[in-house]
Amino acid sequence: MGHREDLLTGAKRCLEEKGWSRTTARDIVAASGANLASIGYHYGSKDALMREALFASMSDWADDVQRSFEADEPAGGGRDAELRERFETRWTRVLELFDKHQGVWRSQLEAILQVRHDPELRAAFGRAQPEGRQGLVGMLHGVDESEVDEETSRVMGSFYMTLVSGMIVQMAIDPDLMPSAHDLVEAMRRILGEAPETSETSATPEAPAAPEVPAS
């Protein structure tokens, strides 16, 4: 790798280990084996390098999630049951990889808190939003993100991004209190007015008994 790639790799490592706010230019130099002058030469500034490293790290998480998904879709149960099962299965994997990449997500949260005072960082997050929404729909629906239309990206992608944002905050406070994928599905069921799921309602219903034939 050249110095540019080394710097990006080093900055990503610093985001994971030290976080957004605590990473210094010297930390990046130490992690990359490059030199201070090369940061300005290749990226213009340490802040620009950090922005690129943050979004590259989030892209790495998305790639990791995508690789972890099983190719097979849930079979049987009708379309609604399929959607619920697929969401629960895939969101469970998302949560598992949240934990694996939690250093990056903590860094993202730190960065978000800085956007009010950093117009360039704010603009970078703004540019990433449409692509992020589209990518989340593609991952969780099991389709190529190029097939996700604008309306679906706006409605469903925004919903998924809201879930992700909430998970980032919850993880920062207390990871043990994060709701499971099943909890989220159950919450959505109740919001839509469905009865709470119990062991009886979640079980496969028994076939009705045959009607009695009246005696002749």
Positions of PLM-derived features:
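Amphipathic alpha-helical packing segments from all-alpha helical-bundle domains
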Residues: 62, 67, 99-109, 119-144, ...
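Hydrophobic alpha-helical segments that form the core
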Residues: 104-107, 112, 150-171, 181-191
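Hydrophobic alpha-helical bundle segments that form small-molecule/ligand-binding pockets
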Residues: 73-81, 115-123, 130-157, 171, ...
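Helix-turn-helix
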Residues: 6, 10-52
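Actinobacteria-biased recognition of intrinsically disordered, low-complexity terminal regions
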Residues: 198-216
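Hydrophobic alpha-helical connector segments
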Residues: 52, 66-104, 156-160
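Short, basic, alpha-helical segments at the C-terminal edge of helix-turn-helix-like DNA-binding modules
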Residues: 55-62
